[in-house]
């Protein structure tokens, strides 16, 4: 059966002072099934509707408040995706440019925005960001190499990071965008061991 694995993933969470959190996921996936023999012909594949285990599409679920969703690869926007708003999530049907056969790889970028008030809590000048460290990518997901980058507003002082499972925290860095003077603090987290759906849990990051 088709066996899709995320070989590398970078999840970037950018907190804006304008009431918005921008999330972008860079994903490299590989079909770990039996390797396709010979060359691929889309015509033959569609004509024969062969039983070869190819992944044509997969579903991912975003937060219910997700908006401004985009799906693209190195070539540009991929228009074959479909989006459906459910009661508790936004379902996105992602369809790569080509069906994925055994041994084939795919790279894509999925991005969206969520309102900050759903994830940021404050008491005076102290803030706590609470949101998913890893989110749903596809059913029965396995993520081999994972990086989370949290970009805070310029001038923030980074506090404690709490993870629901063991992770490695790299040294904090600064991210500069247009008109930034002092830079925006970046907290970088790496996984320790493969991640699965059991790791879809919230982190907490304090800052001032």
What are these regions (language model features)?
Residues 1-208:
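Lumenal/extracellular ectodomains and adaptor appendage modules
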């Amino acid at each position: 059966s088709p066996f899709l694995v995320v070989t590398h993933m970078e999840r970037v969470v950018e907190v804006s002072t304008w009431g918005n959190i921008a999330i972008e996921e860079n994903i490299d996936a590989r079909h770990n099934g039996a390797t396709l023999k010979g060359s691929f012909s889309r015509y033959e594949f569609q004509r024969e509707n062969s039983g070869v285990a190819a992944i044509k599409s997969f579903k991912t679920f975003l937060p219910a408040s997700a908006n401004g969703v985009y799906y693209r690869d190195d070539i540009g926007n991929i228009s074959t995706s479909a989006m459906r708003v459910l009661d508790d999530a936004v379902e996105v049907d992602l369809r790569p440019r080509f069906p994925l056969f055994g041994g084939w790889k795919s790279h894509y970028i999925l991005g969206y925005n969520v309102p900050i008030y759903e994830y940021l809590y404050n008491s005076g000048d102290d803030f706590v960001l609470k949101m998913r460290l890893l989110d749903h990518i596809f059913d029965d997901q396995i993520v081999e190499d994972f990086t989370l980058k949290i970009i805070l507003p310029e001038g923030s002082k980074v506090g404690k990071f709490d993870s629901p499972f063991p992770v490695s925290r790299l040294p904090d860095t600064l991210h500069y965008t247009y008109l930034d003077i002092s830079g925006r603090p970046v907290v970088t987290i790496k996984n320790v061991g493969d991640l699965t759906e059991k790791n879809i849990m919230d982190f907490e990051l304090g800052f001032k």
